[in-house]
């Protein structure tokens, strides 16, 4: 029964990856078309375009690795597995930093704080987006290189046996993996929670101000607050289980877990990227309108 559940989780994982690939390809194409047509692109769309590319490559790599691992009956070098892991780590870290940068941009642009730091950020963050995107890539490259450097103390075995008798020494790379994930994920989590908290505080102040002025509090600024806040909260709801599931999959005791627990970890680890991509589309006016036209739901 548990084996059937685990097999179903693998099938669901493959389907979710296909959905994620299609959603991110859609995000890439729409933003690229707008960029080419108008010869300009907004800061948020630039981040979304970069995020779409990274997730498209990451999900494609994950899908190829999953299909190869499930279907292959021949022995394969563990170095190939290591290559997949390193590429996935780099692309995954980059995509998470891009989302973090997107949340920072929303927070800075939408909140109405009059502090000098916020005013300075409002004026200067948009021109700095290309450099900040490059910084996200460099940080991801650093954490990936850190993993490689620390794992050199525990060299990989020569071969991984056939899929029905696969055995990994999970203790060998666990320290380097945990350090790399914690260094990157902790800072991302703190920044995203802070951005969401500032948005909530700004929304509360805005509503109180509108109520004092005896005017309706639901206006374009309120709508922008709520839309960005929903996207951030949904991101955190998907991101926290994803981070835990991803880390658990590489812990030493994961090999001894039952099939049911492994299946749950696999589903949570796979759900984040496609789920968040769908949320981006349905909360982004231009992407949502284009999606409705494609699906023939235009009124």
UniProtKB/Swiss-Prot annotation:
CDD domains: 7tm_TAS2R4. InterPro entries: TAS2R, TAS2R4. Pfam families: TAS2R. This is Taste receptor type 2 member 4. Residues 1-9, 68-81, 153-172, 252-262 are extracellular. One of its GO terms (cellular component) is ciliary membrane. SUPFAM superfamilies: Family A G protein-coupled receptor-like. Glycans are attached at residues 164-165.
């Amino acid at each position: 029964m548990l084996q059937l559940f685990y097999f179903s989780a693998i099938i669901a994982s493959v389907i979710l990856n296909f959905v994620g690939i299609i959603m991110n390809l859609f995000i890439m194409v729409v933003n690229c078309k707008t960029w080419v047509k108008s010869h300009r692109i907004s800061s948020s769309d630039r981040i979304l375009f970069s995020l779409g590319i990274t997730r498209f490559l990451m999900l494609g790599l994950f899908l190829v690795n999953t299909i190869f691992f499930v279907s292959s009956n021949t022995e394969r070098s563990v170095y190939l597995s290591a290559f997949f892991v390193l590429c996935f780590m780099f692309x995954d870290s980059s995509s998470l930093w891009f989302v973090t940068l997107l949340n920072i941009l929303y927070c800075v642009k939408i909140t109405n704080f009059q502090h000098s730091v916020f005013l300075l950020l409002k004026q200067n963050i948009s021109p700095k987006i290309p450099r900040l995107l490059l910084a996200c890539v460099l940080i991801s490259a650093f954490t990936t290189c850190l993993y490689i450097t620390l794992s050199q103390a525990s060299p990989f075995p020569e071969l991984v046996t056939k899929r029905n008798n696969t055995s990994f020494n999970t203790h060998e790379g666990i320290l380097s993996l945990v350090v790399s994930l914690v260094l990157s994920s902790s800072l991302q989590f703190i920044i995203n929670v802070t951005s969401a908290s500032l948005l909530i505080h700004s929304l509360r102040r805005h509503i109180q101000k509108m109520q004092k002025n005896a005017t309706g509090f639901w206006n374009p600024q309120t709508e922008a607050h709520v839309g960005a806040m929903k996207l951030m909260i949904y991101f955190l709801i998907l991101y926290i289980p994803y981070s835990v599931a991803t880390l658990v999959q590489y812990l030493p005791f994961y090999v001894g877990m039952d099939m049911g627990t492994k299946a749950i970890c696999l589903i949570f680890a796979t759900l984040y990227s496609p789920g968040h991509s769908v949320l981006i589309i349905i909360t982004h006016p231009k992407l949502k309108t284009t999606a409705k036209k494609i699906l023939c739901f235009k009124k």
